[in-house]
Amino acid sequence: GWLLVEKLRDGHATSVGAASGVVAGLVAITPACGALNPLGSLILGIIAGGLCALAVGLKYRFRYDDSLDVVGVHLVAGVWGTVGAGLLSTTTGLFYGGGFRQTLLQIIIALVTIVFSGVITLVLGLILKATMGWRIDKDAETSGIDQEVHAESAYDLNASSGGRFGGAFADAG
């Protein structure tokens, strides 16, 4: 699903898109894994990939910070997997003759989960703001938070990149 959206939207599919699509499928199947057959699982995963690829693109339009695409992948795929279980369940799913009841229950539980998670996140965020603050000071941001807090950098930007296998292997001795 993700690769198809990339191909249609951008003219090419990417390896990052392939990996993100796999993650989206795994997230989506998690709430539905005990209720779907293999075909339903494939359908759920393919749709999850497409929905998440579209959702990740929205962060640029709405200008919100989601550097790891947590909202676009985990929230969207999780909600789709929860609702999709109500549609594709082999015992109670709408598409298997189970009626709309299970789908409605799945929608309700997805909404309850979103509200619960939002409230808990807000409370924890306010506690953090009151105790530590949400932002680091400008000097720490300029020098790098890894250096400021841990006295080290996550990346050795001065490493040699020579040698057959790059700097890390060349310097390893």
List each model region and its residues.
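Glycine- and aromatic-enriched membrane alpha-helices
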Residues: 1-173
